[in-house]
């Protein structure tokens, strides 16, 4: 059973102070991708001010970190799991930012209650920043939730807003380019934060399922995934090769957890 509490020290968070997150059984524990997204917020505080959205907030860690920034006035965290919402509310109180956060039970951008629908309606065109660390989606190439994040965000972001979006290295630059081609209001600017090379740990059933999905996508002619070759640092493996090597050697491929910066223009091309 995972630990029920994660503590991040002040020295990790560039002036945001120490943060503690409770994640009891049945809620989302922090992952390496979560920690990288937290580092992006801590290292790029100057980009965040005003009102924000946290898509798929889980137990609230990214929204809470953003609310520690003095220039951030409020954040709305969107989360489909009731258990996660309850823990997120407790974490906001624990970390002293409850007055700056609203947590909304929602399926993507769609709240489950009329009251919360009215709250979301009041945010249209007024959001200054969006942060999102989506999971891998199922029944597609794993990138579907990231497309959903940007598709739905257009309704809420003001012109000039910024997006911090978690996109792990293995998805490759071609998918990022395609994301901006599909949604031309968004422009990719740079990588805000990245972990060191780390195992895409196939001892985790969820990551093994992801790699199998990636291999199936490549088999259907989809865009190849990108994993560095442990045997030759100048070459890369696609998902099918990485999966075959894992079954042969038991060795997980490598990746980096990353947070990417996009900006938003309501009229593409401005």
Q: Which functions belong to the PLM regions below?
A:
Residues 140-144:
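Glycine/threonine-rich flexible loop motifs
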Residues 145-159:
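A short glycine-rich, Lys/Arg-flanked "PGG" loop and its adjoining helix->strand segment in the class I
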Residues 160-167:
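Conserved beta-strand signature within the Rossmann-like core of class I S-adenosyl-L-methionine
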Residues 170-178, 182-261:
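Class I S-adenosyl-L-methionine
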Residues 260-268:
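Conserved beta strand-loop-helix elements of the APE1-like EEP
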